[in-house]
Amino acid sequence: MDNFSFLYMEPKKYARMKLSILGKLDMKEKEMNIFDIIGPVMVGPSSSHTAGAVRIGFVSRKLLGEPVKSVQLLLYGSFLATGKGHGTDRALVAGLLGMQPDDERVPYAFEEAKKAGMTFAFGEANLKEAHPNSVVLNMVGLSGRTLEVIAASLGGGRMKICKLDGMEANFCAEYPTLIVQNVDQPGCVATVTTLLSLLGINIATLQLYRDSRGGDAVMVVECDREVPGESISLLEKQDGIERVTYYSME
């Protein structure tokens, strides 16, 4: 057992502590977001620097759509300043291996990555006007698929995907989410919304971004339920659609 592991509280003990605190809250307090009060059940000393970092890695892996073969992680702000002391580095790697914040293997993520054959390297991110708990992940999957993710840890174990391959995204991975990169031309939005309507899938939120008129654009569509894989493949074949990335809650 290395010195790093002593930073962590055993998850079951942490959960019991939280239940004890919750039992003392009155009903009005219980209406608050519990994560805002005491944070998630997790392995690690910080909901922002550890639990949120695990979530960033986990969601990024799912967006890549396959196991990560290699990754470059560029830390920014307080992530960079306290990355080792709060276990942010190990937490990110743990998430990229598919671990959740309460996984007892989080302190040993580097060793687990070696077993899995996943290589990783850390550096400093050069970002402007970014959240202080930000990271850039440049991932390569087993098939050779690549994806760049810029993400931020918001506190309480919550996180946000800020950009995908340089395009705005801004979603928190709390719904099944379609990220559609397309040409900015008439009909692309209708193609996506019509397909979802035919599938009986309600749209929770819809964000649209473009770099210029007629240039590159992106749709971020948070859905009330999962989108079937065959429908995603169908979307990718439509005129004007360049790439579809999907975050599944399953």
PLM segments and residue spans:
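Intrinsic-disorder-associated, low-complexity terminal segments enriched in Asp/Asn/His/Tyr and depleted
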Residues: D2-N3, Y8, D26
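Intrinsically disordered, low-complexity segments enriched in serine/proline and basic residues
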Residues: F4, L19-S20
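A conserved regulatory-domain signal marking ACT and ACT-like small-molecule sensing domains
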Residues: F122, I150-E250
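Short, hydrophobic/aliphatic alpha-helical segments
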Residues: E29-V41, V71-L74
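A structural-propensity feature for long, helix-poor, extended segments
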Residues: Q72, Y76-K115
